[in-house]
Amino acid sequence: MFGLKNFFKAAIFLSLLGGLTLYIIRQIQYQSDIMPFEQYNPPSTLIVEENPITKAKYPFIDVHNHQFDMPLKDLSKLTAEMDSLNMAFMVNLSGFRGLYLKECLDNVKENAPNRFGLFVNLDWEEIDSPDFMENNLAILRKAKEDGAIGLKVYKGLGLTDVDSNGKRISIDDERLDPIWEACGELGFPVLIHSAEPASFWLPKDKNNERWLELKQKPIRYRDPKKIPSFESILAEQHHIFKKHPNTTFINAHLGWMGNDLTRLGNHLDSYPNVMTEIGAVLAELGRQPRSARQFFIDYQDRILFGKDSYNVAEYYTYFRVLETKDEYFNYYRKRHAFWKMYGLDLPDTVLRKLYYKNALRILPSIDSSLLPID
């Protein structure tokens, strides 16, 4: 017989079951309204003037580019793309060394003799070898003789490169001093990429502005328990700038200080032998148009145009940020910038210096006939 006690038990059970069912239904409904952050990219409803640009206002020199197949590359196709952008000259930082570098230079000399420059690259991990310095100074001299125009230092130095004992090689290791000095003597600018965005050292959580990039590219995370801090790596880099005032350094990617232009300005004030460039950090500039515009005006003799990874369509965003007054438009890669861009509307005098004049000053072997005569 179904008694009162059992009735209450059944009522409680059904009530709990109903509540659980309602909870599950609501969770399903809630989850159905959730999308991954990567997918959320609604078209803007803002109606403002738009001035997309596919060709730079002035011929420009790209001082930060990578072409990894230069010995065999069809340069006629590449130069046609460059012409479409108004790119007068490209610096390929991935020249490597030895026979590879020679084959790169031979291809350029035969097929596009005045459109490309090659930077040589060195291997730091042989630093303990007795003939390390002799070999590397010989590489630099031979590269200069063959037609290379500078030295590119990759981020491995200071981050991941180690000596024969497994010890990290610091950027300011005194054993490398003769190389920096030799570059000054040879007239080789040193484009050096040190560290990464500071956010790569921070916890991968909701407070990290680079969370999406670290999610999509987890290898970029820098564990502070295993890797020297962002600030210590920058300090090593800045130390060589101070120690070698007769060598011209190009601090790549705005020295990862594009989010703090006051600091970057102080940095340039401290080291007159240092230039900087904007490769892969346009997103920092496009979100602070007033500050960035003033920075470009104040330091117009110290900034070079660079792009880094080569993609024709991505240059369009660079031109639009640098040349227009456009508001609230997309950057081309969400993991670098989930925010919108604003144009800096740089003055023509500043644009000319950014696009080609500053590069010509530190890379005088570039054929100036490719560029306007002011």
PLM feature spans:
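N-terminal Sec-pathway targeting helices
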Residues: 1-17
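An N-terminally biased module of ancient metal coordination in phosphate/nucleic-acid-related enzymes
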Residues: 24-114, 358
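Active-site gating loops and adjacent loop-to-helix segments of metal-dependent hydrolytic enzymes
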Residues: 33-39, 57, 162, 198-225, ...
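Acidic (Asp/Glu)-rich catalytic clusters
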Residues: 52-54, 78-84, 103-116, 138-148, ...
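Hydrophobic faces of well-ordered beta-strands that scaffold small-molecule active sites
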Residues: 61-65, 89-92, 116-121, 151-153, ...
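Acidic-and-aromatic substrate-binding clefts and catalytic sites of carbohydrate-active enzymes
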Residues: 67-75, 92-102, 125-134, 161, ...
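H/E-rich (His + Asp/Glu) clusters that bind or coordinate divalent metals
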Residues: 71-72, 79, 225, 230-374
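Active-site gating/metal-coordination segments in enzymes
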Residues: 101-220
